[in-house]
Amino acid sequence: MQEKIKNMIRFAIRARQYALGETIISTCSKGNAIKLVLIASDASEASKKKYCDKLTYYKINYVIYSTKNELGDLLNKNEISAFAIKDANIAKQVYKLIKEGDWYGI
């Protein structure tokens, strides 16, 4: 994962503007709380489908990105299959960096 993106994600963590795993699914239906979701490339197909379907339904941007271990390392956890950013500005920056290809991911 590229350093700029890691720093932006860490900023979201410090600002407590994030959600993990199943919390993402329940938070989606509560208005505009989630702005961007990073789904691990090595998450199970069933998990990817569940997240993608729900996020598409609620028109929330998502990206298949990184691995479960890399996402988990940012939070000092083992593995995380999905990481959501709640802050619009941070989400916009992360999405822009990923779409520009400014990373060494998958």
Language model features: what each stretch is:
Residues 72-106:
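C-terminal structural segments of small proteins and small subunits
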Residues 4-39:
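N-terminal first-folded block
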Residues 51-80:
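Mid-chain, well-packed structural core segment of small domains
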Residues 26, 44-45, 91:
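Glycine-rich nucleotide phosphate-binding loop and flanking beta-alpha elements
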Residues 30-53, 61:
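N-terminal positively charged helical leader segments and presequences
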Residues 20, 64, 82-84:
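Structural signal for conserved beta-strand scaffold positions within catalytic alpha/beta enzyme cores
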Residues 2-16, 88-100:
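Contiguous effector/interaction surfaces
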Residues 23, 42, 67-70, 88:
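Short, ordered loop/turn segments at secondary-structure junctions
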